Design a protein with these regions (language model features):
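C-terminal segment of classical bacterial N-terminal signal peptides
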Residues: 24-31
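Short beta-strand segments
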Residues: 88-90, 113, 140-144, 223-226
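Divalent-metal-activated hydrolytic enzyme cores
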Residues: 14-18, 37-80, 107, 116-125, ...
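Boundary at the C-terminal end of the N-terminal hydrophobic targeting segment
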Residues: 33-35
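Active-site cofactor/substrate anionic-group-binding motifs, chiefly glycine-
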Residues: 91-104, 108-122
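Glycine-rich, flexible N-terminal cofactor/catalytic loop recognition
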Residues: 72-85, 90-95, 105
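N-terminal secretory signal peptides
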Residues: 1-8
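N-terminal export leaders
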Residues: 9-24
Length: 226
């Protein structure tokens, strides 16, 4: 087994997946026409999701995928890229989407990251670019176990431990999810991780006109997972 590969038993199984939907009435006809003219994805949303699920199962059974020689693929992808999925995930250094989804090659997924996988303006712009210009047909907002940003938000709600500086602003974006999960059955942090992923998937779906349009015409799906 590759010594650089994370132990798959630690977390990297996709434990829960949720899908969000959008009514066509929310999007005007001019926007729908624009969406129809955008770059077509190489996979349908459901095909992309199935590919990620299969890759995750492959990773859990054979993490040696990280031994792949990426030099060849790096050369192949120098001039262009065509990712079929966009992943919004946490900056945690233990979370490596390319490995979690089966040792994917360069150019297959478009990854955007910040602490706590928050769909802020920068991340929404990145998601739009992946969907509109690169042809990504699936957006996954992915939380993870033992997330430090989510734990900090839970501590802020439960213990009043509010960090300062820009970290405080980041934690503040996750606090509403922690407030909703406070007192629920199960692990407080784990519940908040899932709720935070759900909320940011919902933000992605409702705040971005580009995402709305592509979802409405069936060329994009938005899901959340942990």
């Amino acid at each position: 087994m590759c010594k650089f590969c994370p132990n798959p038993s630690r977390r990297h199984v996709i434990a829960g997946i949720g899908t969000l939907s959008l009514g066509a009435a929310l999007v005007g006809p001019s926007r729908l026409a624009m969406a129809a003219s955008l770059k077509k994805p190489s996979f349908t949303p459901d095909e992309a999701l199935s590919k990620l699920k299969a890759g995750n199962a492959k990773y859990l059974s054979s993490s040696e995928e990280c031994e792949k020689d990426l030099a060849k693929h790096r050369k192949e992808e120098e001039s262009s890229q065509a990712p079929w999925a966009t992943i919004l995930t946490c900056s945690d250094s233990r979370v490596v989407p390319e490995l979690i989804f089966g040792g994917l090659n360069l150019g297959e997924i478009f990854v955007c990251r910040n602490a706590g996988n928050i769909a802020d303006d920068d991340m929404l712009g990145t998601i739009e670019y992946g969907a509109e210009h690169l042809g990504s047909s699936l957006v996954v907002v992915m939380g993870h176990q033992h997330c430090g940003a989510v734990t900090a938000a839970c501590n802020a709600v439960q213990k009043g431990e509010q960090p300062g500086g820009f970290i405080g602003k980041l934690v503040g974006a996750i606090t509403p999810a922690a407030e909703v999960m406070m007192g629920k059955d199960g692990d407080f942090v784990a519940n908040t991780v899932l709720e935070n992923a759900r909320r940011n998937a919902e933000t992605t779906l409702t705040a971005s006109e580009v995402v709305k349009d592509l979802v409405t015409v069936g060329e994009l799906k938005v899901i959340y997972a942990t």
